[in-house]
Amino acid sequence: SKGSMGNLFYYEDALHAVGLRKRFDWPTNTSILKISNSGKVSYKFHSFDRNVVKAEVNESILYFLYEDSGKTLLRDATNNIDLINSEVTIKDFAFNDEKTYVIANSFSSPDEIYELSNGQLTKISKANNSFTKKVKTWDCQYKRIDTGKSEVDTWGIFVGKDKPTILNIHGGPATQYAFTFFDEFQTYASAGFNVIACNPRGSSGRGHDFLRDVCGNKWGVTDMHDVLTSFKNMKKVMGITNKNDGIMGGSYGGFMTSWIISHHPNMFKSAIVERALLNWETMV
């Protein structure tokens, strides 16, 4: 095969995997692929336009995790239903004695093990109880913002309208910020900063076309528009009046931070460029 794949499993008497049918298709969704006896690779669910994270078969039923608009959800692919549709991130799942167990977190709650039944999560572990009893955690405000050219999933932690704000840009860009517990955001908020983050075009979780909308000469154009427009609008939604704004990001987020401050040098009071990819030719 010319693809890039892993997570091999058998389903309906055929070998399957999660990955790319052709390795140079990236960036695109990782999908469930069917591998014939002759080695031919085809899409199992060609119309399912989301990024598949993990797949597993249990009692002849195929389940998989997938990203969708900042959530990572568990789907019964055989019966074409989601087992949960909450603002959570499911990181892994397993089955035992006809019960479903998941490792999950949310924006304000770190990882725990839950039993999943009828779309509801029941916590059964206490791994982070001592942490959450001692440490204040911050929940988010969420809004899908219309930038005029796209709709962008945007999150904000509100500390105070008179507090400074950090715009944080994720790496990738083919990944997503999410309804997940992110220690960096929690640390910034606890230090007194409002935090805003978004999934601009180029991010995963919104399908193939959205993910590839930074390719070619759109790099640094469509994504910068989405980042800055969603940031400005989210500040208004949150009622923040302080104009002391900072910007930061790592990897691709470091590139975008550098790109933005070079195009808009007076927009932010401070900038932090982390492990940035600034030049494709040299990979510096």
Model-predicted regions and their roles:
Residues 249, 253, 257:
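Gly/Ala-rich beta-loop-alpha elbow adjacent to hydrolase catalytic centers
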Residues 127-237, 243, 250, 278:
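Cap/lid segment of the alpha/beta-hydrolase catalytic domain
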Residues 207-209, 257-284:
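Hydrolase active-site cap/lid region
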Residues 1, 6, 65, 81-158, ...:
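Non-catalytic accessory segments flanking enzyme active sites
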Residues 31-37, 115-117:
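Beta-propeller blade signature
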Residues 8-10, 56, 94:
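Conserved beta-strand position repeated across blades of beta-propeller domains
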Residues 1-6, 18-32, 45-52, 64-73, ...:
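A flexible loop/linker signature enriched in serine peptidases of the S9 family
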Residues 13, 59-60, 98:
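Short coil/turn segments that connect the beta-strands within blades of beta-propeller domains
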